[in-house]
Regions:
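Membrane-interfacial helix termini and adjacent extracytoplasmic/periplasmic loops
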Residues: 18-24, 64-65, 132-171, 205, ...
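Transmembrane alpha-helical segments of polytopic membrane transport and secretion proteins
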Residues: 1-36, 64, 108-113, 282-299
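C-terminal transmembrane helix and the adjacent membrane-cytosol boundary/short C-terminal tail
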Residues: 32-33, 45-49, 183-198, 210-211, ...
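Short membrane-interfacial helix/loop motifs at transmembrane-helix boundaries
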Residues: 2, 39-78, 242-243, 290, ...
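Transmembrane alpha-helices
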Residues: 35-41, 118, 122, 126, ...
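Transmembrane-helix boundary motif in ABC transporter permease subunits
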Residues: 66, 89-120, 133, 137, ...
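Non-cytoplasmic
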Residues: 45-53, 178, 219-254
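Interhelical loop and adjacent transmembrane-helix boundary motif
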Residues: 17-30, 67-76, 238-284, 289
Length: 299
């Protein structure tokens, strides 16, 4: 019998020995082999389609001037501005609501708390079309609000199909993406710092501004970037609700499927991707992600 087994020691597995820093440094070929599946997936489902989309832009009648066309054409430019404004507004509203609610949920224990948290995060499991349908059931022609206003005032209040309905739909599916990050940041806040600030005479407002918000800021920034990027590219909710609103994903869909204007659809897709990528890259740079942090030695 093996000596290691007699002494009650188990040998490290082959995979764990490969994953140690020393093995990785000694065997770069192992890392290369392990990276191949990921590289194949990235190439097949991202790089190759992206290259094809970029080529389609140049194949249009305007050539590479298609990018200039979408920035000067009134319809495309208005759609881009509307999408940016909508995404920014939804992001700001989600951050404000989730900062308040998330901090409250972390610092208070009450009956039904877990149910409330589950309800707030439920939209994560819904596709965009379901979210749009729920907004229609709330504020559509046969919705709850329309029925109540018809009974009370004799006319239906319908706003599911305009900018307000789309805003509510975007906000609904954005809340879970923000509140989870806010709650994670709130759990790490040091209550002793708040007590120290109060003991030094700081008002509640100053404690919030100088202690609580700086502690929540990393979670707010990262979740805000994800919320903005998600809202920029949201299609299902816009497809269900945006009958009179030309947000960028809907314009891309219309140009590609109905007008067969593939070069313009490709150029709009590239612009949309660059905007969301720039937003996420700026957040990574601002928060310092990826930078090496000094490690303090200890006993």
């Amino acid at each position: 019998m093996d000596l290691d087994l007699k002494e009650g020691r188990s040998r490290p597995s082959l995979l764990s020995s490969f994953l140690t820093p020393r093995a990785a440094a000694a065997s770069p070929a192992i890392l290369t082999v392990l990276l191949i599946p990921g590289l194949v997936i990235v190439a097949a489902f991202f790089l190759i389609p992206l290259a094809r989309v970029a080529v389609e832009v140049g194949n249009g009648p305007e050539g590479w001037g298609t990018y200039l066309l979408i920035l000067t054409n009134a319809r495309y430019l208005e759609s881009l501005i509307q999408t940016l404004a909508m995404s920014a507004g939804v992001t700001m509203m989600a951050l404000v609501l989730c900062a308040v609610v998330g901090l409250f949920l972390v610092r208070n224990r009450f009956a039904g708390r877990s149910i409330l948290i589950g309800t707030l995060t439920l939209p994560l499991s819904f596709p965009g079309t379901v979210v749009g349908f729920m907004v229609i059931m709330l504020a559509g022609r046969q919705g709850v609000i329309g029925g109540l206003t018809d009974a009370a005032f004799g006319s239906k209040l319908v706003f599911a199909y305009d900018i307000a309905g789309l805003f509510i739909g975007y906000l609904y599916f954005s809340i879970p993406r923000v509140i989870l990050a806010v709650m994670a940041s709130a759990e790490k806040l040091d209550l002793q710092l708040e007590e120290a600030a109060r003991s030094l005479g700081a008002s509640r407002f100053r404690v919030i501004c100088d202690v609580i918000l700086p502690g929540l800021m990393p979670g707010l920034i990262s979740s805000g970037a994800i919320c903005f990027a998600t809202a920029m590219g949201a299609f299902g909710t816009a497809f269900t609700l945006a009958t009179d609103i030309d947000v960028l994903p809907m314009v891309i869909y219309t140009e590609f499927t109905r007008n067969a204007n593939i070069p313009v659809a490709a150029a709009l897709s590239i612009v949309l991707g660059l905007i969301t990528w720039a937003c996420l890259a700026a957040v990574r740079s601002f928060t310092g992600e990826g930078k090496s942090l000094p490690v303090r030695g200890g006993a």
